[in-house]
Structure formats: C-alpha cells, structure tokens
C-alpha cells in the first residue's frame, strides 16, 4: 500500500513536475550514480538534477545534529510535529524542481541523483511517497578505493574542499581515511535501506556490478520495476553512448572522475590493512549484498 502524501502548501502542484515522475537515485558516492543518471537523462522527456543535497540538508540535521531533541517540542524538525514540516520539505523539492527543469513540468521525468544526500532518503521518500526510488549499491571496498583515488593529491576532487597546498586526507593518513569512508558508507546504505523498505511505491534495488556486467538488461529491469515505459531503441542507444568503452581515453583513468569501472579493482588499490579495516566495518553489508566474495575474506 502506498503512503498518502503529506499536505502541501503549494497550489497547483499538477502544473509543475509530477511527484510520481520523480526518480530518486540513493546509495553512496562513487557507486556509478552519475553513469546511471546520465543513461536515464539521455532519453527523450528526461532531465537530471545533479546532487541538490536536500537529503543531506535535512537528514544530517535530523538524524545527527538534533539527536534526541527531536523527540521534544522545541526542535524545528520535531518527531511529533512531522505534519508541520514534511509538507514544506515536499514543496521545497517540487518548487526547486519546477524552477530548474521547466522542460519536464507537466509530464516529463526528473531523475534526482542524490547519493551524497542519502542520509535523508527516509525523510524524502516520506515527503514524496508517489515518487520512485532506485537503491544503487556497490561493493564497499571498491567505493573506498575509488574515493581514496578521487581525493588523493592532484586528483579531480582533491582541491574542492580544502587548501590545495595541504596534502589530501588519503595522502596524509590513508588508513584513517579508509575507516572514515567505510563508516560513512554504512550510514548512507543503512538509511537508504530504511527508506527502501518503508517505501510503498515503485522501487528497485540495483548492484553496480550487475549494471556493469549486463547494462542493457539491467536497465530494462530498472524500468520494468519502476513501471516506466521505455522505448527499446532509445534505451539501447543511451546505453551504448555512455558505455565505458566509448569514453575517450583522456577522460578516464587514475585521478579522473571516471576511473576504472572494474568490479573488484580494490584488490589492486587497497593495502591488506585497508581491506581489513573496510571489511570489519562493513561486514554485515558485504555478507548480505556480496556473499559470493566470502572466499576472499574468510569468516567475518
């Protein structure tokens, strides 16, 4: 049974982006969400909102900053006063979408790529229960390896959030960075799982590894599960256009945003100590989603 949408203060929702035509991509960063979103965006009648971080805005505040205060009467996002703020949250997303993507108002599809806002996915799916959800997951060891490369000195993300004159976090203390990123992975995936399990609408869970191994059939499965009609020839063209093999060589490789696209590449990238750190922290999720790798890990 699908949940009822919270009351919205915005009149004429039907003239904006239809809530049921929003497709969220949640999970964690460095999981292939840009690739997946780009394949969907390339289809006629689609647009992609690239990481609005609305999930981070509300989720980080609600789950971590407020803590137990949300159970009382004074926190603005109080648990017992959800009816007062879920509607405005809904308005924020729909209003922001309509202002930015008028080309899909009235009938098009909007893919919202929000891996780094996945901490707030339970709240967003509660605010927009008509919307569709993709739970995208990738082996945590590959996620950590990719993240370490992205934030290493001289790499594509290294200078965005810190002084470029300082050595990046993965370079200064790679083991500490691996630990931090593994813990972040657990938080993001657990919240995404919570949202996925609670969502009564259309949804699908996808492993990056399956998307990489058989892209076209996995995309077909996604559209079937989400109950979105898709033109076969257009889907095939989009998959081909965005395939790893068709990315120019100068745009991929170590230190680039598109790095390996190689499941299991962590075996070449992480030290044994880093592997042990990541596996210890993420063991329950590895056992659940990647049981076929048990022989490489031993008993966890």
Task: Please give the residue ranges for each predicted region.
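PAPS-dependent sulfotransferase catalytic core
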Residues: 1-96
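PAPS-dependent sulfotransferases, especially Golgi type II membrane carbohydrate sulfotransferases
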Residues: 1-23, 148-151, 157, 174-181, ...
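Short, well-ordered beta-strand elements within core beta-sheets of diverse protein domains
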Residues: 24-26, 206-211, 266-268
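A short, structured active-site edge motif that brings together acidic residues
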Residues: 51-55, 137-140, 235, 239
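PAPS-dependent sulfotransferase catalytic domain
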Residues: 62-63, 108-233, 244-255
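Alpha-helix-centered segments that form part of catalytic cores
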Residues: 85-110, 178-188
């Amino acid at each position: 049974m699908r949940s009822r949408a919270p009351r919205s203060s915005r009149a004429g929702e039907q003239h904006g982006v239809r809530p049921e035509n929003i497709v969220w991509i949640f999970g964690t960063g460095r999981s292939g969400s840009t690739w997946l979103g780009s394949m969907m965006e390339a289809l006629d009648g689609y647009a992609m909102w690239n990481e609005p971080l609305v999930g981070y805005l509300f989720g980080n505040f609600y789950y971590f900053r407020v803590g137990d205060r949300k159970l009382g009467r004074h926190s603005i996002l109080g648990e017992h006063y959800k009816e007062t703020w879920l509607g405005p949250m809904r308005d924020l997303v729909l209003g922001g979408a309509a202002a930015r993507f008028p080309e899909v108002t009235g009938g098009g599809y909007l893919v919202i790529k929000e891996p780094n806002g996945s901490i707030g996915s339970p709240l967003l799916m509660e605010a927009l229960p008509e919307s569709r959800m993709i739970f995208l997951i990738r082996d945590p060891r590959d996620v950590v390896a990719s993240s370490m490369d992205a934030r290493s000195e001289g790499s594509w993300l290294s200078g965005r959030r810190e002084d470029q004159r300082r050595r990046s976090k993965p370079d200064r203390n790679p083991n500490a960075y691996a630990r931090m990123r593994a813990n972040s992975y657990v938080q993001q995936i657990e919240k995404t799982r919570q949202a996925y399990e609670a969502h009564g609408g259309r949804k699908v869970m996808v492993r990056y590894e399956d998307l990489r191994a058989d892209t076209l059939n996995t995309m077909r499965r996604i559209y079937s599960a989400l109950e979105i009609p898709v033109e076969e020839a257009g889907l095939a063209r989009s998959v081909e256009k965005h395939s790893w093999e068709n990315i120019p060589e100068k745009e991929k490789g170590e230190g680039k945003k598109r790095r390996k696209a190689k499941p299991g590449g962590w075996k070449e990238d992480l030290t044994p100590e880093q592997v042990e750190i990541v596996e210890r922290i993420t063991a329950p999720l590895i056992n659940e989603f990647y049981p076929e790798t048990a022989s490489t890990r031993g008993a966890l």
